[in-house]
Amino acid sequence: MPPSAAASEPLRVVAAVIADGSRVLACRRGPGKDAAGRWEFPGGKVEAGETPEEALEREIREELGVPIRVGALLDRTTTIVGTRAIDLACYAAALTGAVPESSTDHDLLRWVEPGDLDALDWADADRPVLRVLGAS
C-alpha cells in the first residue's frame, strides 16, 4: 500500500465505558502521552487479527491490570484529530475482578456520575459518546 493510502486509513481504536452502579470510569492521560491532561475512557488500538472486543479486553488488561467483560457497542464515530482520523468504537464493559487503582497510560482514575462528565476536559475522540451516556 502506498504511504499516502496508509496515512488516509482511520486509526481503529476501542474504549470501555466501565460502569460501577451509576458511575463510569474516566481516566486522565498522563504526562508525555498524546492529549496529556485530557480525559478519556480507557482502551487503545485494535491490532491486526483482533476483533474490537478482543482488543478492548487486551488493552484494559495492559493499562489497568484488570479483566473486563465487553458488552454492547454504545457508539462508534470517526473524529479528525490533527491530520489523523480516529475511528473510535465505545463499548459498555463490566469489571470481572478487582477495581483498578492505577494505569500505565493515565495519571488519574475517577468514577464519575453521567451528569458530571461535562465538567472534565475530554479528548476530542471521546466527546461523542458523552451524549449517549446522558451528559448535557
Model-derived features with residue positions:
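Conserved N-terminal beta-strand and adjoining loop/helix that marks the start
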Residues: P2-L25, K45, R76
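Residue-level signal for inorganic ion chemistry
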Residues: A16, F41, L109, E113
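A structural signal for short, well-ordered beta-strand segments
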Residues: A16, L73, C90-Y91
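Conserved Nudix-box catalytic region and its N-terminal flanking loop in Nudix hydrolases
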Residues: R23-E62, V66
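Structural detector for helix-capping/boundary residues
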Residues: G44, R58-E59, G71, V112-G115, ...
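Active-site-adjacent beta-strand/loop module that shapes the phosphate/pyrophosphate-binding cleft
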Residues: P67, T77-P100, R110-P114
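NUDIX/MutT-family hydrolases
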Residues: A92, E101-L133
